[in-house]
């Protein structure tokens, strides 16, 4: 379970799941994400928790495409050989942009705009 009975995240369980995926044969990077943040790990790097920027429920306009936006941002960072942490930060920025719009298209921003939204952990 990634959540404790009180609803809070159980980050050690998330870390264990990521390590199990690596041990099962994932050769590059594993990222497990949820609204609060993402755990990232690679065979040659220790795991790290990278929190997302908080959005109040009333700020969220729509959630269609937010998970896909997260994945797209992460994959872009990987393709461009960004660090694991920066790839996840870009993924968070992409998901946040999507959540602030009513549909999956209006949240699309330029890379420069997304970089400005990347939050240091």
What are these regions (language model features)?
Residues 2-121:
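Conserved phosphate-binding/catalytic region of the ribokinase-like
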């Amino acid at each position: 379970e990634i959540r404790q009975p009180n609803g809070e995240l159980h980050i050690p369980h998330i870390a264990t799941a990521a390590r199990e995926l690596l041990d099962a044969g994932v050769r590059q990077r594993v990222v497990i994400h949820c609204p609060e943040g993402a755990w990232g790990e690679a065979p040659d790097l220790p795991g790290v928790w990278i929190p997302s920027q908080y959005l109040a429920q009333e700020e969220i306009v729509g959630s269609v495409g937010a998970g896909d936006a997260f994945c797209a941002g992460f994959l872009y960072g990987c393709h461009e050989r960004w660090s694991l942490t920066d790839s996840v930060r870009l993924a968070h920025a992409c998901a946040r942009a999507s959540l602030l719009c009513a549909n999956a298209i209006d949240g699309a921003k330029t890379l420069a705009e997304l970089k400005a939204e990347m939050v240091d952990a």
